């Protein structure tokens, strides 16, 4: 009757549940439903599914969360004329912090101050020094004395004054400002809100969703999987965001309709032994998570000598698939970054093989060809066959080392980084309905110890 949270592993039908909830809610003649998710890419994929369901377009709005924020802030003139920082990283904010430090003496550098501001002050919505003095700093490893906090708050005031002068606002800060405006003026623009992939949101974003709809029957419907949290550092707690999803307000889906049991087992082994927060004070578990399709081929993982051999192995696997009457359009080749796909793209072009590059909301190439994308872009998609490149300890580490990228992280940040890499590989593997192939060169990823890797020689 009120807020509902539906969680579950990959392929359990969470998004399908959200889509049918949308169709049901739009049967109300007064419906004005918001369907939102974290990325533009997911919104585009969902749009196709909504169209197939025949949901009346005048009854709902479909947008990613940032677009919803900007449209809402513009409509109600919140921070009108301000530029939003941090859509492409934190460099703009760090530059402002460096300006603050040019005239101030402090033991803290710009990165620490930026993180403290975003992860504590903005995250918890601290409005003044008194609130910040009393604020528990969950997840921050460096303890601060009262004197240090007072000093930090003075720097924050200078930082905010500089932003005011430049007419810029931090992205998450704009979420808080807009949320406060809606709550203070008792404005709730939507009759219902549906949010897919809730694990990708942060607390300021969840508070914003809470403010978009009045509390009541069918107000919020949230779907997601805490284990698929692939965006490092995005902390979330429903209770702290004012969203009650405890007890009967939560449901967990456990039957995987997409992947075979052998694929599911390997995917689960990647995240096994790691504590994943259920985002409401408990721990997320994969217990009882089973595949409807019990039989299937186990994922293959092979280590080769170099990048050329890696590309050659992918070509061989593709040939096997085509010989088994699998279409090119049913295959996706993915890597941790687009840079790792350059040689693969060149080989496909040289061989005259049709392909399509998926990058953000753009799809460039032949729709009947094999898809190329990053692991992150695989989110929300599914294929008959998934081929993963660049699978080694460097790109998908199982433990922290003394070098890059761990050298600049504290223990908490290292743990979060490693968890996000596990989640990323879990997401990538579970996009496949039938076959998973993984290849890399160098040291094998320790995340895949459960899979027997074979050294291949193409000489």
Where would I find each of the regions flagged by the language model?
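Conserved helicase motor core of SF1/SF2 NTP-dependent helicases
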Residues: 4-34, 40-82, 154-168, 183-356, ...
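Short coil/turn segments at secondary-structure boundaries
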Residues: 5-10, 129-135, 166-176
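ATP-hydrolysis module of ASCE/P-loop NTPase motor domains
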Residues: 78-148
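Ser/Thr-centered flexible coil motifs
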Residues: 145-152, 202
């Amino acid at each position: 009757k009120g807020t509902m949270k539906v969680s579950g592993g990959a392929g359990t039908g969470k998004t399908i549940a959200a889509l049918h909830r949308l169709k049901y809610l739009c049967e109300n003649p007064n419906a004005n439903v918001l369907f939102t998710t974290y990325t533009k890419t997911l919104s585009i994929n969902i749009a196709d599914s909504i169209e197939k369901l025949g949901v009346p377009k005048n009854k709902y709005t479909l947008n990613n969360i940032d677009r919803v924020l900007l449209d809402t802030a513009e409509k109600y003139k919140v921070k009108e004329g301000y530029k939003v920082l941090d859509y492409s990283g934190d460099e703009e904010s760090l530059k402002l912090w460096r300006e603050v430090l040019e005239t101030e003496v402090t033991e803290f550098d710009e990165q620490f101050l930026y993180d403290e501001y975003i992860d504590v002050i903005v995250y918890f919505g601290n409005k003044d020094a008194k609130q910040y003095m009393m604020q528990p700093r969950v997840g921050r490893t460096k303890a601060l004395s009262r004197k240090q906090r007072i000093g930090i708050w003075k720097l924050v005031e200078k930082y905010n004054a500089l932003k005011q002068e430049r007419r810029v606002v931090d992205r998450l800060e704009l979420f808080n400002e807009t949320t406060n405006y809606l709550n203070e003026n008792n404005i709730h623009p939507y009759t219902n809100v549906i949010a897919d992939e809730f694990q990708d949101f942060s607390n300021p974003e969840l508070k914003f969703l809470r403010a978009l709809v009045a509390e009541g029957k069918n107000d919020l419907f949230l779907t997601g999987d805490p284990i698929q949290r692939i965006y490092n550092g995005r902390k979330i707690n429903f209770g702290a965001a004012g969203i009650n999803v405890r007890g009967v307000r939560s449901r967990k889906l456990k039957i995987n309709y997409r992947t075979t049991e052998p694929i599911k087992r390997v995917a689960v082994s990647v995240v096994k032994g790691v504590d994943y927060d259920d985002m409401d004070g408990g721990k997320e578990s994969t217990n009882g998570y089973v595949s409807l399709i019990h039989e299937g081929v186990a994922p293959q993982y092979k280590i080769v000598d170099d990048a050329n051999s890696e590309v050659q192995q992918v070509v061989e696997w593709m040939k096997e698939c085509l010989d088994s009457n699998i279409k090119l359009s049913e295959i996706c080749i993915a890597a941790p970054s687009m840079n790792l796909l350059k040689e693969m793209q060149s080989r496909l072009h040289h061989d005259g093989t049709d392909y399509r590059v998926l990058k953000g909301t753009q799809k460039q190439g032949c729709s009947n060809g094999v898809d190329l994308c990053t692991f992150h872009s695989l989110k929300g998609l599914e294929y008959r066959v998934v081929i993963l490149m660049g699978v080694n300890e460097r790109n998908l580490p199982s433990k922290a080392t003394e070098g890059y990228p761990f050298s600049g992280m504290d223990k908490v940040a290292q743990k979060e980084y490693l968890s996000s890499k596990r989640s990323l590989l879990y997401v990538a593997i579970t996009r496949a309905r039938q076959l998973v192939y993984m290849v890399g060169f160098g040291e094998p990823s320790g995340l895949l110890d459960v899979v027997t890797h074979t050294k291949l020689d193409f000489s």
